[in-house]
């Protein structure tokens, strides 16, 4: 069953990286709206599935636009190998995007607008900007917008009235949900920017081993600096500081472990090293999101979301994530 070409086309392991983005945004903006959160759980579920459908539509459309390149570099993929017809893939992409937009419309007009913006951004990336200078910037923007998408439920008519006094956006405790939302979005942006920058060399045979090794060292230093900045801001912004720190330290440890292993692989084959880093950084996005969720709702909530890495890792052994 895991060898089914449609599962490979949809890259099922990747699906588990999507819900945490939405949950982070949802919790960030709803911390000061505890009375409204219960009635908004349905919106959270709808936004999660909408985001998943948009993501799947993006993956399929990516393979449709890349079919000529994949015939040379990845001939075993479902489309270039002929296991799935191009027309079938096109229908799947249209269906996924349509479902994503329709579900968003059930939340509110802002959610629908963001879902439309996500779809347009995904298609522009796949068609025009995937191989250009703006590649990492656009992909990072799309994924960070997904976090904001999770917070879009707040514009529903039933909760907008709660914002009229402005007290919830900047509470007496000094906590600002909007600043936390911005921080979480920036964290996801940075992570995806690094990931996408690296993935550019994934199918390039002329990757220099020495250059890759230097890149790994630079990335590790950059990550360390970024985490220090994030930690400093998080201490001020999040309610559950210790819970956040626990998972951030886990994230830091896993990032260090990832690049240490990649450095050893570099001596064998640069291309395989890039694939290894890209795949695992995608999985580690779940842990990064889980840290913010722990800071927003406690360690238990963050730990539960972090468990999404398990099906991601297991399925990733049989189905390519890149």
Enumerate the language-model features and the residues they cover.
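N-terminal, positively charged, Ser/Thr/Ala/Gly-biased leader segments
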Residues: 1-23
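C-terminal membrane-associated helical module and adjoining short loops/tails
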Residues: 2, 7, 152-322
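Intramembrane alpha-helical segments
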Residues: 2, 7-8, 76-158, 168, ...
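Alpha-helical transmembrane segments of integral membrane proteins
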Residues: 13-17, 21, 42-50, 88-92, ...
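Membrane-embedded alpha-helical segments that form the functional core of polytopic membrane enzymes
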Residues: 18-65, 97-105, 110-125, 176-193, ...
């Amino acid at each position: 069953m895991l060898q089914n070409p449609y599962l490979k086309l949809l890259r099922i392991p990747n699906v588990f990286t999507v819900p945490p983005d939405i949950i982070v945004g949802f919790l960030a903006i709803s911390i000061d709206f505890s009375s409204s959160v219960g009635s908004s759980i349905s919106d959270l579920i709808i936004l999660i599935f909408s985001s998943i459908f948009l993501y799947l539509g993006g993956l399929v459309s990516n393979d449709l636009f890349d079919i000529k390149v994949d015939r040379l570099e990845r001939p075993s993929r479902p489309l270039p190998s002929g296991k799935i017809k191009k027309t079938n893939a096109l229908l799947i992409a249209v269906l996924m995007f349509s479902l994503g937009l329709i579900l968003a419309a059930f939340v509110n007009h802002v959610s629908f607008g963001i879902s439309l913006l996500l779809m347009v951004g995904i298609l522009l990336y796949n068609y025009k900007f995937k191989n250009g200078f703006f590649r990492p910037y656009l992909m990072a923007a799309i994924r960070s917008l997904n976090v904001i998408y999770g917070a879009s439920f707040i514009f529903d008519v039933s909760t907008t009235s709660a914002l009229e006094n402005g007290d919830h956006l900047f509470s007496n405790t000094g906590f600002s949900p909007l600043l936390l939302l911005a921080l979480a979005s920036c964290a996801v942006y940075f992570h995806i920017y690094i990931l996408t920058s690296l993935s550019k060399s994934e199918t390039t045979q002329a990757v220099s081993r020495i250059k890759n090794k230097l890149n790994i060292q630079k990335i590790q230093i950059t990550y360390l600096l970024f985490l220090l900045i994030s930690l400093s801001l998080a201490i001020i912004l999040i309610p559950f500081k210790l819970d956040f720190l626990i998972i951030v330290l886990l994230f830091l440890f896993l990032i260090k472990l990832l690049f240490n292993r990649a450095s050893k692989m570099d001596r064998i084959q640069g291309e395989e090293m890039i694939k290894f880093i890209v795949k695992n950084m995608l999985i580690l996005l779940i842990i990064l999101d889980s840290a913010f969720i722990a800071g927003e709702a406690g360690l238990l909530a963050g730990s539960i979301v972090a468990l999404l890495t398990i099906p991601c890792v297991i399925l990733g052994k049989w189905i390519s994530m890149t």
